[in-house]
């Protein structure tokens, strides 16, 4: 498993290194301007680099998890004896490692800004831990709601325009399904709320976490089962 995770990380290392260098460079510019002009410019820099960090996480997750998922992106791992479930979680863990690297880099500057402006206290570390856990869930949701459907379509649909239409239909289908669940079950407005920002402005209900984890587990389980049956047939 360790060798497989390392292999997948090496496949996206150029993108990850370049992205981190850009984020780090812009944040350092913000810190320098903070010393010269005040915290307002640092806040602008951090706001921009936070968006860039989220995009970098999505890109690296997409690049890793799409490997060995369809005929178009087979690697040496597909020629190994790894089971499909091992490959799936190997890619997921590799995506998590890349995401944690980005998050820690960006969070260092966020906390620096928060401490220098007294907007974040030491006791707010729980929000950081909760936010990190939620980022893991968001990555899992991104893989299950987007990467897996796209990979499935690429294996079963040849025409590119049909693939694109299929992706849009699937995404809308998942969105509508979740909206219906919210309408009838109130999963996103139920009791038991976790705040992942120090000021409490971004809160998520426990029921919505359980709902999305269950839905993702069903999608991932079906995908792994299908890939395993296909491998056994071959």
Question: Where in this protein do the model-derived segments appear?
Answer:
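Hydrophobic alpha-helical transmembrane segments of membrane proteins
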Residues: 1-73, 84-234
């Amino acid at each position: 498993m360790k060798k497989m995770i390392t292999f997948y990380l090496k496949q996206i290392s150029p993108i990850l290194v370049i992205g981190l260098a850009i984020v780090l460079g812009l944040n350092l510019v913000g810190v320098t301007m903070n010393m010269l002009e005040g915290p307002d410019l640092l806040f602008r820099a951090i706001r921009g680099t936070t968006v860039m960090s989220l995009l970098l996480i999505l890109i690296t997750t997409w690049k890793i998890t799409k490997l060995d998922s369809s005929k178009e992106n087979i690697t040496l791992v597909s020629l190994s004896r790894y089971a499909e479930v091992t490959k799936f979680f190997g890619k997921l863990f590799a995506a998590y490692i890349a995401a944690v690297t980005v998050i820690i880099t960006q969070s260092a500057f966020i906390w620096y800004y928060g401490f220098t402006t007294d907007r974040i206290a030491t006791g707010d570390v729980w929000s950081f831990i909760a936010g990190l856990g939620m980022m893991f869930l968001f990555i899992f949701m991104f893989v299950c709601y987007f990467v897996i459907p796209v990979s499935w379509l690429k294996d079963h649909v040849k025409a590119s325009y049909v693939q694109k239409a299929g992706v849009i239909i699937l995404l809308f289908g998942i969105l509508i399904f979740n909206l219906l669940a919210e309408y009838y079950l109130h999963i996103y407005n139920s009791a038991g709320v976790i705040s992942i920002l120090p000021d409490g402005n971004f809160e998520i209900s426990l029921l919505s976490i359980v709902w999305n984890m269950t839905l993702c587990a069903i999608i991932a389980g079906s995908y792994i089962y299908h890939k395993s049956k296909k491998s056994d047939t071959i």
